[in-house]
A protein has these predicted regions:
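Phosphate- and other anionic-substrate recognition elements at nucleic-acid/protein interfaces
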Residues: 1-152
Length: 152
């Protein structure tokens, strides 16, 4: 989700089924022009995780190394607290909080500021809004900072 914090509206939505398709996409140029990319960071809840989680973490690292701009890793807990003031918030609560704040999604003939947002884009939009509205906090990381420390 490309979010314009000044105009408070979605500029673009995009899904890439693979890392290679992302790197070849025209939208990569758009991503490289932004100052910061915010990504939801994977958190441990003490449960066993599957291959999908490891692929996601690898993908975040790949993205950070590819785009050449700052990457802010945002924990989901922080997004929940910012938008819903509750750690128990679910996806439906986050979606409703975004609609309450920015207005209806709208239709093709009368698009709202969130027009086109559906499914997993709600979570991505929540991360983008959080990153645009808050300073970096403990528990969040900047990939740039890690590069400077030679961890990545």
């Amino acid at each position: 989700v490309w979010w314009d914090a000044d105009e408070q509206r979605v500029l673009e939505l995009g899904t890439f089924p693979s890392f290679m398709q992302f790197s070849k996409a025209v939208k990569l140029d758009m991503v490289c022009k932004v100052k910061t990319v915010a990504c939801e960071w994977i958190e441990s809840y003490g449960m066993a995780v599957g291959q999908e989680v490891f692929r996601t973490v690898a993908g975040i690292g790949w993205l950070a190394g590819t785009i050449g701009t700052e990457v802010r890793l945002v924990p989901r807990k922080a997004v929940k607290m910012h938008l819903c003031q509750s750690m128990r918030a679910k996806d439906a609560n986050i979606r409703q909080a975004l609609i309450d704040r920015f207005g209806v999604v709208g239709t093709k003939k009368a698009p709202g500021p969130l027009f086109g947002v559906s499914s997993h884009y709600w979570a991505a939009l929540a991360v983008a809004v959080y990153a645009a509205e808050t300073p970096v906090k403990d528990g969040e990381f900047w990939i740039e900072d890690l590069r400077k420390r030679s961890i990545i």
